[in-house]
Amino acid sequence: MIKRYLSKSLTISLRKPKRTSHSACILLLACWAATLPAQKISLDATIYQGSIWRHSPKLTTQSGERIGGQELGFRFHTTGRRDWQAWQHYPAFGLSLGHFRLGEGSHSDAFALLPHLSIPLFQTGRWAAHFRVGTGLAWVTRPYDWFDNANQNAIGSHWNNITQFRLGTEFRTTSHLRFSAGGSMTHFSNGGSALPNFGVNVFSGWAGAAWFLQPLKKEDFQPAKTSKREVLRRFGGQIQGGLALLEIASLDGPKHAVWITSANGYFQINRINRVLLGMDYESNRAIYEWGLHSARFRDEAKARQGSTRLAVFAAEEFLFGDLSIVLQAGKYLGKNINQFVPKASYAKLSARYYFPALLGTEMKTFAGISIKAHKFTAEYISGNVGLSF
């Protein structure tokens, strides 16, 4: 079942939920479900209090007011049944339903389905600290509308991506009950698939409680049987192709393709960590069409040149079994290309699922999604397929 879902190519246009937003959600859930060999489950409840950050002077959406949110979910806690779980200090995979009351001046309410990964940072006695990252699907009740909601320009569609980073400490009171608190940043955006798309960034504090259906004891954690330093091959490469859909310049206008290709080499630090160095190439049809129709490019040759984007990037890939998270930073380069880029540099956050090795070799295909941003504004969300060798 998982392979059947993952074999479908993914294009993300959050304005069209029946076709692509559902595909993105299926991919995220399939990646998450494929990495759940653990048996220890906790039920989690969280409340949030924070405010929307005014990250752009062009933002007309209300910001700075106190807002709140709630979250209910569950986590599967790994116990070392596979060596990588011990190497990664026994992470937890979870799924949550969330709600943020953004306010009447800020698109009203946001409801979210959020798969997430919790990574332990340290544990001593009854205390522990965790970092959590998640990305999923959100529904915003009152997006921008030319007739009914023209004064709120952060989000231009009902369907959006939600990406959240959360840091917190946890205190174990009994074998079943734990309390936690910390801080978080939650981002809502459609990745430019529907304008306007400045996005909503919520910075908040949070407090929560977790009830373990079965006690999670120290003796439940199995040590790794092998060393994470035993790497068969230190150097390798990856190639990847992707597709995103964008609106540009005109609200409710046509959507244009952004074709993305990347190639990189990598150095395998250990069996759960890689450093990547490579190049990104993009053919941005949104810039091409907009530049021609607005006479910013005098002919098709200039339009092709101006809509080409080339960049070098460095990245780090964190491996969790067949799932990985890639943090990437890039810088544009080249003369007479990269026209109309918002900034000189960008960042990407990617999630990948690796399929079994091909024909007994080291080669593995993968599928995933990426969100690309210039500072705190997302440019696009893409679906990707690639090969690691």
Give short role names for the model-derived ranges:
Residues 39-40, 79-90, 122-128, 173-177, ...:
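Short loop/turn motifs that connect adjacent beta-strands in outer-membrane beta-barrel proteins
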Residues 41-60, 81-87, 107, 124-171, ...:
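Outer-membrane beta-barrel translocator/channel fold
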Residues 43-47, 93-95, 131-135, 167, ...:
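Membrane-embedded beta-strand positions of outer-membrane beta-barrel proteins
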Residues 47-53, 76-78, 97-103, 135-141, ...:
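Transmembrane beta-strands of outer-membrane beta-barrel pores
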Residues 57-60, 100-103, 149-155, 190-197, ...:
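Extracellular loop and loop/strand-boundary signature of outer-membrane beta-barrel proteins
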Residues 64-70, 89, 107-113, 127, ...:
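Residues that define the transmembrane beta-barrel architecture of outer-membrane proteins
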Residues 72, 201-222, 349-351, 378-389:
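Outer-membrane beta-barrel "beta-signal"
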Residues 90-141, 209, 267-269, 273-337, ...:
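Gram-negative (and chloroplast) outer-membrane scaffold detector with strong preference
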